[in-house]
UniProtKB/Swiss-Prot annotation:
Coiled coil: none annotated. Residues 31-292 form the CoA carboxyltransferase C-terminal domain. Belongs to the AccA family. Component of the acetyl coenzyme A carboxylase (ACC) complex. First, biotin carboxylase catalyzes the carboxylation of biotin on its carrier protein (BCCP) and then the CO(2) group is transferred by the carboxyltransferase to acetyl-CoA to form malonyl-CoA. It is found in: Cytoplasm. Pathway: Lipid metabolism; malonyl-CoA biosynthesis; malonyl-CoA from acetyl-CoA: step 1/1. InterPro entries: Acetyl_CoA_COase_a_su, ClpP/crotonase-like_dom_sf, COA_CT_C. It comes from the Bacteria. This is Acetyl-coenzyme A carboxylase carboxyl transferase subunit alpha. It comes from Listeria monocytogenes serotype 4a (strain HCC23). The keyword Protein biosynthesis does not apply. It catalyses: N(6)-carboxybiotinyl-L-lysyl-[protein] + acetyl-CoA = N(6)-biotinyl-L-lysyl-[protein] + malonyl-CoA.
Length: 318
């Protein structure tokens, strides 16, 4: 099957065997029903064993799966009356970041997220989900608008990182990211950030200064990709698997380190297996988080966000 991952090979081989037996059973006089049922039970156990013991590298592969749901996929299922807004009012519109206004269970909100492409043409249009400065500035424009009108902000994070090209640097890539961090820290409305795939470095942080941060179970969040870390540490990008295991990039790691506030369960095998079921899990998390944060005053939201990020990286105090 296309787009299947290395660690899933035993599952795919058993599924193929079951499919062959079912096809043979339909045209043969021999009844193989019992054998098929036994193999299906074995398949269920095998899937549970493999998917419940995934390594950091396995999860990294799932986070980058080409069929993994994107921001727009979730927006279509989670929000009503979504109206996309375009442009940073300074240079142009960046398709690597989408955003606009919508309602969530009757509550007016602003939704912003990285957007990867679905195929080669779409990925070129979206720059593979790697924003230029105008993408971050568009996001900030929408956040300031939300802050002005008292709309909670919901961010979906899914990027390898900010685009490192020359044009992006000339237009102030680092300043655009830093400006978002600075401005988000002082927003008077609730901010919820959810890592739905890959949370790569500053490109992810530019949408990540939230009152609460959540990660999907198989999402990853790191300052550099495992391939990049391996190239720096061992001068060998093929050591990416080794790097992934030592970098603590998984949802479990980030929650244990106190960087995120919760883990959103994924359907067995990854979010791409059942978009509707995965959207429902995200729905539950947003509902609970929004209910809690909307009880805070403006001053409490700013203070809570400040205290949250001040504690990150603190291991001991005098």
């Amino acid at each position: 099957m296309a787009n299947e991952m290395e660690f899933e090979k035993p599952i795919l081989e058993l599924k193929s065997k079951i499919a062959d037996l079912k096809e043979y059973n339909e045209t043969s006089d021999v009844d193989l029903t019992n054998e098929i049922e036994k193999l299906e039970k074995r398949l269920g156990k095998l899937e549970s064993s493999i998917y419940s013991n995934m390594t950091a590298w396995d999860k990294f592969q799932v986070a980058r799966h080409p069929e993994r749901p994107t921001t727009l996929d979730y927006i279509s299922l989670l929000f009503e009356d979504f109206m996309e807004l375009h442009g940073d009012r300074a240079f142009g519109d960046d398709a690597a970041i989408v955003g606009g206004i919508a309602t969530f269970k009757g509550v007016p909100v602003t939704v912003i997220g990285h957007q990867r492409g679905k195929d080669t043409k779409d990925n070129l249009h979206r720059n593979f989900g790697m924003p230029h400065p105008e993408g971050f500035r568009k996001a900030l424009r929408l956040m300031k608008q939300a802050d002005k009108f008292g709309r909670p902000i919901i961010c979906f994070i899914d990027t390898k990182g900010a685009y490192p090209g020359r044009a992006a640097e000339e237009r102030g890539q680092s300043e655009a990211i830093a400006r978002n961090l600075y401005e988000m820290s002082d927003m008077k409305v609730p901010i919820i950030s959810i890592v739905i795939g890959e949370g790569g470095s500053g490109g992810a942080l530019a949408l990540g200064v939230g009152n609460q941060i959540f990660m999907l179970e198989n999402a990853v969040f790191s300052v550099i990709s495992p391939e990049g870390a391996a190239a720096i540490l061992w001068k060998d990008a093929s050591q990416a698997k080794k790097a992934a295991e030592s970098m603590r990039i998984t949802a479990g790691d980030l929650f244990e380190l106190g960087i995120t506030d919760g883990i959103i369960p994924e359907v067995k095998g990854g979010a791409h297996r059942d978009l509707n079921a995965q959207a429902e899990e995200i729905n539950k998390t947003i509902t609970k988080s929004l209910h809690a944060l909307m009880a805070f005053s403006e001053e409490q939201l700013i203070e809570q966000r400040y205290e949250k990020f001040k504690k990150i990286g603190v291991y001991d105090t005098l």
